[in-house]
């Protein structure tokens, strides 16, 4: 996650935008915190003289205009972006509802539910709006308020975007214990949560297959097509765009410019 944050791991610019919704992110978090495998990722070492990909940072990562990446993500964009955005970034995660409405969310885990083996882990994952308040009755009734640290401590709700940073979660632990006046029950709950969720998550790894920078262009193209025909499948246009991108030709941009120049929107449109 740190290399995504610093821009050393980036995406080929032709890669589609991030498309995972809120429910899918919560399911991924649940799988990872349970230690379940979520599949491998595939990277390409940057610097192949015959492949001229433009690159861009992962959604939510700081701008890295002056950073030359070490590697590009060929497969695993959705999973890695979800993990980075929800478990590492300080920003609210830009995602969408099941119906496609764009939303911004922070992710929490209910410690009481998380340590209870009879409760499905996904049911302990909670997403809240950017203001960290869940409301009902058109905003008039507050169902859950996590807008301050004290509210987090009071409701045993751990902010997931600090879970990969030992210094941050250790400080949260100290403040949590202080808030509860070092109550033995609170201490036991946190230590259970630490051993069952935080420590295993810190040891969790996603397998990575790395193609070296000398891999032939044709092989990279074939691999990209093979790994991107499952999951959220790419369209034929997106696959062709990837092929042209290897020669530093931005097919999508060229198509959109020609469409704008020669055709009206109601005659021809490109579906992303």
Predicted regions and their residues:
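Basic- and aromatic-enriched surface patches that contact anionic nucleotides/nucleic acids
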Residues: 1-22, 26-272
């Amino acid at each position: 996650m740190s290399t995504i944050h610093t821009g050393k791991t980036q995406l080929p610019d032709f890669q589609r935008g991030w498309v995972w919704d809120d429910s899918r992110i919560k399911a991924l978090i649940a799988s990872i915190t349970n230690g379940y495998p979520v599949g491998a990722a595939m990277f390409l070492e940057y610097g192949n003289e015959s492949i001229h990909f433009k690159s861009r940072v992962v959604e939510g990562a700081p701008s890295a205009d002056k950073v030359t990446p070490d590697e590009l993500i060929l497969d695993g964009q959705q999973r890695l972006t979800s993990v980075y955005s929800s478990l590492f970034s300080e920003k609210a995660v830009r995602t969408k509802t099941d119906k496609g409405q764009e939303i911004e969310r922070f992710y929490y885990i209910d410690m009481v539910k998380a340590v209870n083996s009879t409760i499905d882990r996904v049911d302990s994952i909670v997403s809240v709006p950017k203001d960290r308040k869940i409301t009902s009755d058109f905003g008039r009734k507050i169902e859950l308020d996590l807008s301050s640290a004290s509210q987090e401590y009071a409701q045993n709700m751990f902010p997931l975007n600090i879970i990969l940073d030992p210094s941050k979660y250790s400080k949260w632990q100290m403040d949590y214990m202080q808030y509860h006046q070092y109550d033995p029950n609170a201490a036991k709950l946190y230590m259970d949560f630490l051993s069952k969720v935080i420590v295993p998550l810190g040891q969790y790894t996603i397998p990575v297959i790395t193609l070296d920078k000398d891999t032939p262009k044709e092989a990279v193209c074939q691999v990209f097509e093979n790994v991107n025909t499952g999951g959220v499948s790419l369209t034929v246009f997106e696959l062709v765009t990837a092929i042209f991108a290897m020669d530093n030709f931005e097919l999508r941009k060229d198509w959109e410019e020609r469409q704008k120049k020669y055709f009206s929107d109601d005659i021809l449109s490109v579906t992303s």
